[in-house]
């Protein structure tokens, strides 16, 4: 995943200093894209160790339509704790929008179910898109969506995915996002009897927090290792029936973890 390291270099060399909501401050660039061929391996960062358990459980949590951290905590995942209220609630964030988008007429739309059925029915559609940016509900969310939309594309029997991200915590968040959307693409491809194609990231405000700069420089001293492979052990009847134990990451040999504080 040398392209990720090149993005770190880009921000360190070309980023402008900006104040931000968290008060930490960032080095920021605008409008960047990364591409990953999913045929070449599962894009799990190797220049530092990632917590695979958190990535998988978070995606399963989104797909459940859940917006309370209880499920995550019960499974040893704490990545959303800082934003939850005293009851563990986060408001109508990703899971709510993916599974039960509220329209102006009061009806809800299960976008995940819809997009899978549409891929099967009309794979050439240019409307294979899911959005989490529900303007009418943004003020109810503890954290408005950073990765706010994703689109699928089918060609030559392969499913590709591109996701849009308005705000990109490049050191901590982006490696998780890459792996999460890669996993989602594999799952939906399996459900639609397709192979996987390309994964594309498109970011708006792409930044490094100022308290992540030394960690990014350390990471740049490390040589990327071969990508691992994802094994999905079974094909459930629906996208919503996958369990943590269905996934295995094979031959993951990363460099050691690099600790960095989360900007809340």
UniProtKB/Swiss-Prot annotation:
PROSITE patterns reported for this sequence: THYMIDYLATE_SYNTHASE
Similarity annotation: Belongs to the thymidylate synthase family. Bacterial-type ThyA subfamily.
Pfam families from the UniProt entry: Thymidylat_synt
Catalytic-site annotation from UniProt: 146
Record pathway: Pyrimidine metabolism; dTTP biosynthesis
Alphabetical UniProt keywords: Cytoplasm, Methyltransferase, Nucleotide biosynthesis, Transferase
GO terms for cellular component: cytosol
CDD domains: TS_Pyrimidine_HMase (cd00351)
Protein name (record): Thymidylate synthase
Classification via Gene3D superfamilies: Thymidylate synthase/dCMP hydroxymethylase domain (3.30.572.10)
Enzyme Commission designation: 2.1.1.45
Main location: cytoplasm
């Amino acid at each position: 995943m040398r392209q990720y390291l090149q993005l770190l270099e880009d921000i360190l060399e070309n980023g402008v200093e900006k104040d931000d909501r968290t008060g930490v401050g960032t080095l920021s660039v605008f409008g960047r894209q990364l591409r990953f061929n999913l045929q070449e391996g599962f894009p799990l960062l190797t220049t530092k160790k990632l917590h695979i358990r958190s990535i998988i459980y978070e995606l399963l949590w989104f797909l459940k339509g859940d917006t309370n951290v209880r499920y995550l905590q019960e499974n040893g995942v704490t990545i959303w704790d800082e934003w939850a209220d005293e009851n563990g609630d986060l408001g109508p964030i990703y899971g709510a929008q993916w599974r039960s988008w509220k329209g102006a007429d009061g009806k809800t739309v299960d976008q995940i179910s819809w997009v899978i059925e549409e891929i099967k029915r009309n794979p050439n559609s240019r409307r294979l898109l899911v959005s989490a940016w529900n303007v009418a509900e943004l003020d109810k969310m503890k954290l408005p969506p950073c990765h706010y939309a994703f689109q699928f594309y089918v060609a030559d029997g392969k499913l590709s995915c591109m996701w849009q991200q308005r705000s990109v915590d490049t050191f901590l968040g982006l490696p998780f996002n890459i792996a999460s959307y890669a996993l989602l693409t594999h799952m939906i491809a399996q459900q639609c009897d397709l192979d996987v194609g390309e994964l594309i990231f498109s970011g708006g405000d792409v930044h490094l927090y100022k308290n992540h700069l030394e960690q990014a420089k350390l990471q740049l001293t490390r040589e990327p290792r071969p990508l691992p492979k994802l094994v999905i052990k079974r094909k459930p009847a629906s996208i919503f029936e996958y369990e943590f134990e269905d996934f295995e990451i094979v031959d993951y040999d990363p460099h050691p973890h690099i600790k960095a504080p989360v900007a809340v």
